[in-house]
UniProtKB/Swiss-Prot annotation:
Listed Pfam families: zf-C2H2
Induction summary: By alkaline conditions.
Any GO CC annotation of this UniProt entry: nucleus
Zinc finger (C2H2-type): 16-40, 46-65
One GO MF term attached to the UniProt entry: DNA binding
Key words, A-Z: Activator, DNA-binding, Metal-binding, Nucleus, Repeat, Repressor, Transcription, Transcription regulation, Zinc, Zinc-finger
UniProt name for this protein: pH-response transcription factor pacC/RIM101
Major localisation: nucleus
The gene coding this protein: pac1
Function of the molecule: Transcription factor that mediates regulation of both acid- and alkaline-expressed genes in response to ambient pH. At alkaline ambient pH, activates transcription of alkaline-expressed genes (including pac1 itself) and represses transcription of acid-expressed genes.
Length: 65
């Protein structure tokens, strides 16, 4: 996730609407949009230590366990 997708508060370029293809999800917090953008990326860095299933976001792993 790069500054171009999320923006920067210090430059008044804070864009809280997802710009990925036709997705237009909007949030009020920067960390929420950063977390949302992860659903568009194929990485799954959060792995269950019990069954080995992997998830894109930590909250998805937490729901699984």
């Amino acid at each position: 996730v790069c500054e171009r997708h999320v923006g920067r508060k210090s430059t008044n370029n804070l864009n809280l609407t997802c710009q990925w293809n036709s997705c237009r999800t909007t949030t009020v917090k920067r960390d929420h949009i950063t977390s949302h953008i992860r659903v568009h990326v194929p990485l799954k860095p959060h792995k269950c230590e019990f069954c080995g299933k992997s998830f894109k976001r930590p909250q998805d792993l937490k729901k699984h366990v």
